[in-house]
Amino acid sequence: MQATTQIKTPVVGKHVYGELYGVDEALLKDEERLRKIVIEAAHIAKMHLVEVNSWRFKGGDKEGVSVIALVLESHIAIHTWPVYNFATVDVYTCGEHSDPMTAFRYIVSQLSPKRFTVNYADRSFK
């Protein structure tokens, strides 16, 4: 009888990112609401939240909010440009059990863009 050995990939990296167009300007300025969205996205995607930081920037076309959640598996980030009704979303996870696409879809559902792009990159160690 021959033994079967399963070789595991040492690092499983899943990266989902995209751009959201036509998002409500007031929502893109609402730092507290964006923080709550990121926290819930981490929860439903089976990520372990370590810390959330956010910053509100004021001034013309540079105005916006950035929210970055450090999760045990990696990170979630939202950056907004309210004057353009535009946001970027970045969800990167390491590990087999977390689901960055679920987090991305949740964020999109909460921001309700008129249109969006989504990209996926396998960033696993091979």
UniProtKB/Swiss-Prot annotation:
Pathway: Amine and polyamine biosynthesis; agmatine biosynthesis; agmatine from L-arginine: step 1/1
Keywords from the UniProt entry: Autocatalytic cleavage, Decarboxylase, Lyase, Polyamine biosynthesis, Pyruvate, Schiff base, Zymogen
PTM entry text: Is synthesized initially as an inactive proenzyme. Formation of the active enzyme involves a self-maturation process in which the active site pyruvoyl group is generated from an internal serine residue via an autocatalytic post-translational modification. Two non-identical subunits are generated from the proenzyme in this reaction, and the pyruvate is formed at the N-terminus of the alpha chain, which is derived from the carboxyl end of the proenzyme.
Transmembrane segments: none
Record's signal peptide: none
Positions bearing the site annotation: Cleavage (non-hydrolytic): 73-74
EC number(s) reported in the record: 4.1.1.19
Domain of life assignment: Archaea
Record PTM Pyruvic acid (Ser), positions in chain: 74
GO CC annotation, single: cytosol
SUPFAM superfamilies: S-adenosylmethionine decarboxylase (SSF56276)
Cofactor needs: pyruvate
Entry annotation: catalytic residues: 74, 79, 94
Function: Specifically catalyzes the decarboxylation of L-arginine to agmatine. Has no S-adenosylmethionine decarboxylase (AdoMetDC) activity.
Name the UniProt record assigns to this protein: Arginine decarboxylase proenzyme
Source species: Pyrobaculum aerophilum (strain ATCC 51768 / DSM 7523 / JCM 9630 / CIP 104966 / NBRC 100827 / IM2)
